[in-house]
């Protein structure tokens, strides 16, 4: 796998840089050049060649063996989020898949990074779905199991109205589906309409998508 410091990663990012520009909207804002998961170079049509967002993700993702426990290969997206062009491409692509939501739910902790960026792009609010014990009470709690142990997620039971709102769950990685499944149950207990989930990376071999069916799931890269 190529990383940000390699020539391949630099090539991908240099092409992406030509595909992001600014246009007037009162104050200047980013012009959108992401179409159906492809990053278009400036001036190119939708029919011309483009760099896949999946290639961007792959070029800036680091594999870490035996983390956080032995036997687990961790997908570290920190280099992707730290790169302004990589983050911009991922934000645009996820925002496209979350279109129509009036609230975005970001999952603790790396999901916060992309969820906040997507919410800003869509001009909607972001709800922090926290790990157990991180929020002041009263809270709604949901226990679940993931590939390396049990965990708890929580949202505020007061102060934020989620009932009747169309929510899309945003996270960095989809593995077994345990985290997103628990988030969905938590939101639905609060009365939300969970429209789908969007993630940066899907670990296809762990069958998380099947575990979440029939919830619509969108991923930018399947590894």
From Swiss-Prot:
Catalytic activity: AMP + diphosphate = 5-phospho-alpha-D-ribose 1-diphosphate + adenine
InterPro entries in the record: Ade_phspho_trans, PRibTrfase_dom, PRTase-like, UPRTase/APRTase
GO MF term set: adenine binding; adenine phosphoribosyltransferase activity; AMP binding
Gene3D superfamilies reported in the protein's UniProt record: 3.40.50.2020
Any one GO BP annotation for this protein: adenine salvage
Known EC number: 2.4.2.7
GO cellular component terms given for this protein: cytoplasm
Keywords annotated in UniProt: Cytoplasm, Glycosyltransferase, Purine salvage, Transferase
Family matches, as SUPFAM superfamilies: PRTase-like
Intracellular or extracellular location(s): Cytoplasm
Disulphide linkage map: none
Domain of life from the UniProt record: Bacteria
UniProt KW Glycosyltransferase keyword: yes
Known pathway: Purine metabolism; AMP biosynthesis via salvage pathway; AMP from adenine: step 1/1
Keyword Calcium: no
Main location: cytoplasm
Family: Belongs to the purine/pyrimidine phosphoribosyltransferase family.
Function: Catalyzes a salvage reaction resulting in the formation of AMP, that is energically less costly than de novo synthesis.
Subunit structure: Homodimer.
PANTHER family cross-referenced by the UniProt entry: ADENINE PHOSPHORIBOSYLTRANSFERASE
Protein name: Adenine phosphoribosyltransferase
Higher taxonomy: Bacteria, Bacillati, Actinomycetota, Actinomycetes, Mycobacteriales
């Amino acid at each position: 796998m190529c990383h940000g410091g390699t020539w391949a990663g630099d090539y991908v990012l240099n092409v992406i840089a030509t595909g992001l520009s600014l246009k007037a909207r009162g104050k200047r804002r980013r012009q959108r050049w992401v179409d159906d998961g492809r990053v278009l170079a400036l001036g190119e049509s939708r029919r011309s060649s483009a760099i896949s967002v999946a290639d961007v993700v792959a070029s800036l993702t680091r594999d870490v063996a035996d983390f956080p426990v032995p036997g687990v290969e961790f997908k570290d997206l920190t280099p992707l989020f730290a790169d302004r062009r990589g983050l911009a491409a991922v934000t645009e692509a996820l925002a496209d898949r979350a279109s129509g939501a009036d609230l975005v739910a970001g999952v603790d902790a790396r999901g916060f990074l992309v969820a906040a960026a997507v919410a800003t792009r869509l001009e909607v609010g972001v709800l922090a779905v926290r790990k157990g014990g991180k929020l002041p009470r009263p809270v709604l709690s949901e226990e679940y199991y993931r590939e390396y142990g049990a965990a708890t997620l929580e949202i505020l039971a007061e102060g934020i109205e989620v009932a009747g709102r169309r929510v899309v769950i945003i996270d960095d990685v989809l593995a077994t589906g345990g985290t997103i499944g628990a988030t969905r149950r938590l939101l639905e207990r609060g009365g939300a309409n969970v429209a789908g989930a969007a993630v940066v990376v899907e670990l296809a071999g762990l069958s998380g998508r099947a575990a979440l069916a029939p919830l619509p799931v969108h991923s930018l890269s399947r590894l």
